[in-house]
Design a protein with these regions (language model features):
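Phosphopantetheine carrier-protein modules
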Residues: 15-35, 53-62, 80
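Short alpha-helical elements of helix-turn-helix
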Residues: 39-42
């Protein structure tokens, strides 16, 4: 799962221009802390689907919290297994 988190972290940092912010960690709430907005969430899901050739459904979004890099990586890992 560490590789998934690294890819997510790198994508989010590059796409949303997050420099070496000490508050940007794997367990920070990306939305509440203002790192990502709702449009950004769509971009993250698109990145995941393209990178891992999986589909993130509306059901996934409803059932599983995906507010942190840790939570998103868990969903991806579960979809891959």
């Amino acid at each position: 799962m560490e590789e998934i988190k690294e890819k997510l972290r790198a994508f989010i940092q590059e796409r949303f221009e997050i420099d070496d912010d000490p508050d940007f960690t794997d367990d920070v709430h990306l939305f509440n802390e203002g790192f990502v907005d709702s449009f950004g969430a769509v971009e993250i899901i698109h990145f995941i689907e393209q990178t891992y050739n999986i589909e993130i459904t509306q059901k996934d979004i409803t059932l599983y919290p995906m507010n942190t890099i840790e939570e998103i990586a868990e969903v991806v890992e579960n979809k891959l297994s």
